[in-house]
């Protein structure tokens, strides 16, 4: 279904919630209007924008690092230094382990998630129109953090780090004891402890990923609803206030994802 064939607000909303998908069995693009896609599909628009935004982050910060001066810094260098100082201060306050990798990790998470969230402010029809009419693509979504696959993948990476630091600091035996002998320190309660600690451990990445996805999906959906239900000449009455408020949400969600990552890794690095 092309934009020209969309005749109702429901079709418009559904069209903008479809990802550009690749069928991994046939390596062909999936037509979102042919029915539900199979499990073996890849949301290549989410992957593309995630990688591009990550490369932009690396390029910009590398440029600042190479051109940094000890004199009066420029505006962009000042902004980067403020971000680095803010993230470094947050890590110092919340992380009590010895690893020196947490601050760079926190900086990467904060800026990368912020850039992905920032794509929500791109006009809702701009890039999809270009993709459809100039490139012949059936669909396009430009907000990677509104794709649950992206947010849960990032959360899975954090979860792997939690396991790594837990085993590194406590040893395999200490990690197993933590799962089986807490909160009830008696062998008879090992099954209960394992269930409680297992649920607690698994809930960290799940809640981390779903929280970011839910907030960004809701924000994207509101922009789509405004564009799909209101005439073009009145959309700015709601779009502008929501966009201004959404800037706060974009920044806050990146900050929350970073803070929870730091806290979880700090807990994992504690020696018992």
Curated annotation (Swiss-Prot):
Compartment annotation: Cell inner membrane
GO MF annotation list: proton-transporting ATP synthase activity, rotational mechanism
Gene3D superfamilies in the record: ATP synthase, F0 complex, subunit A
InterPro entries listed in its UniProt record: ATP_syn_F0_a_bact/chloroplast (IPR045082), ATP_synth_F0_asu (IPR000568), ATP_synth_F0_asu_AS (IPR023011), F0_ATP_A_sf (IPR035908)
Pfam families: ATP-synt_A
Keywords tagged on the record: ATP synthesis, Cell inner membrane, Cell membrane, CF(0), Hydrogen ion transport, Ion transport, Membrane, Transmembrane, Transmembrane helix, Transport
Gene Ontology BP annotations: proton motive force-driven plasma membrane ATP synthesis
Chain segments annotated as transmembrane: 41-61, 102-122, 147-167, 212-232, 243-263
Chief location category: membrane
Record has Cell inner membrane as a keyword: yes
Function: Key component of the proton channel; it plays a direct role in the translocation of protons across the membrane.
Subunit relationships: F-type ATPases have 2 components, CF(1) - the catalytic core - and CF(0) - the membrane proton channel. CF(1) has five subunits: alpha(3), beta(3), gamma(1), delta(1), epsilon(1). CF(0) has three main subunits: a(1), b(2) and c(9-12). The alpha and beta chains form an alternating ring which encloses part of the gamma chain. CF(1) is attached to CF(0) by a central stalk formed by the gamma and epsilon chains, while a peripheral stalk is formed by the delta and b chains.
Family indicated by similarity: Belongs to the ATPase A chain family.
PANTHER family assigned: ATP SYNTHASE SUBUNIT A, CHLOROPLASTIC
Annotated protein name in UniProt: ATP synthase subunit a
Organism, as annotated: Edwardsiella ictaluri (strain 93-146)
Lineage summary: Bacteria, Pseudomonadati, Pseudomonadota, Gammaproteobacteria, Enterobacterales
